[in-house]
């Protein structure tokens, strides 16, 4: 992991968007640490939108529609759930500074969530940042089997339909590789990023999903 600069508590939403546009993103040492540091990986994780794929078994589950999938209806709740400890993630980097910054980006129309509901219960979701024609995935959670996977599938379908050209996952994991995630070198990523963020901001929501 490549770090840039020292810890900082003076980051504003506008500075955060500028950082994304040049390949940086913030993290914290822990949820209890109010400070952030910038990260610029030497190898950047992306999911090429034209080669995203998933298993036949997951496709079968998706056809059964086990969850009600929504967009941008419970952003704060998704953020809270992503910040909660889980058996496979005893601690997280989502501190109060992160919460405040990404809530501000959501209010500006630059952060979004995909949510899986089981009845009235939020059981899975993910959130990320949109800028130009790029979407930067930040975190996801799952409280039911396959919930976050299904949210990812719906995210990619939405990004494709709306005209996004870059899905940045920051890092690759074995889990994300099953969906087609790859590592790209910093120089190659910079070219892809510049192309994506210099395009006009692509709307994430459909017209009927926008509150009057």
Swiss-Prot record:
GO biological process: protein catabolic process
E.C. no: 2.3.2.6
Gene Ontology MF terms: leucyl-tRNA--protein transferase activity
Cellular localisation: Cytoplasm
Pfam families: Leu_Phe_trans (PF03588)
Superkingdom, natural source: Bacteria
Stored SUPFAM superfamilies: Acyl-CoA N-acyltransferases (Nat)
UniProt cross-references to HAMAP family, sorted A to Z: Leu_Phe_trans
Function in brief: Functions in the N-end rule pathway of protein degradation where it conjugates Leu, Phe and, less efficiently, Met from aminoacyl-tRNAs to the N-termini of proteins containing an N-terminal arginine or lysine.
Name of the protein in its database record: Leucyl/phenylalanyl-tRNA--protein transferase
Species in which this protein is naturally found: Allorhizobium ampelinum (strain ATCC BAA-846 / DSM 112012 / S4) (Agrobacterium vitis (strain S4))
């Amino acid at each position: 992991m490549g770090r840039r600069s020292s810890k900082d508590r003076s980051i504003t939403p506008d500075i955060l968007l500028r950082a994304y546009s040049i390949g940086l993103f913030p993290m914290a040492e822990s949820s209890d640490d109010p400070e952030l540091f910038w990260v610029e990986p030497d190898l950047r994780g992306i999911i090429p939108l034209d080669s995203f794929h998933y298993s036949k078994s997951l496709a079968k589950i998706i056809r059964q529609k086990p969850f009600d999938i929504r967009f941008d209806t419970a952003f704060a709740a998704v953020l809270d759930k992503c910040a909660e400890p889980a058996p496979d993630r005893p601690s997280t980097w989502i501190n109060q500074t992160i919460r405040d910054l990404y809530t501000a980006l959501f209010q500006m129309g630059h952060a979004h969530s995909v949510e899986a509901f089981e009845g009235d219960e939020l059981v899975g979701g993910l959130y990320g940042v949109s800028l130009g024609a790029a979407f930067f995935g930040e975190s996801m959670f799952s409280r039911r089997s396959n919930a976050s996977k299904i949210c990812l599938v719906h995210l990619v379908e939405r990004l494709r339909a709306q005209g996004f050209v870059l899905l940045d996952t920051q890092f690759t994991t074995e889990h994300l590789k099953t969906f087609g995630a790859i590592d790209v070198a910093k120089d190659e990523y910079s070219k892809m990023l510049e192309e994506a963020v210099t395009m006009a901001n692509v709307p994430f929501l459909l017209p009927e999903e926008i509150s009057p």
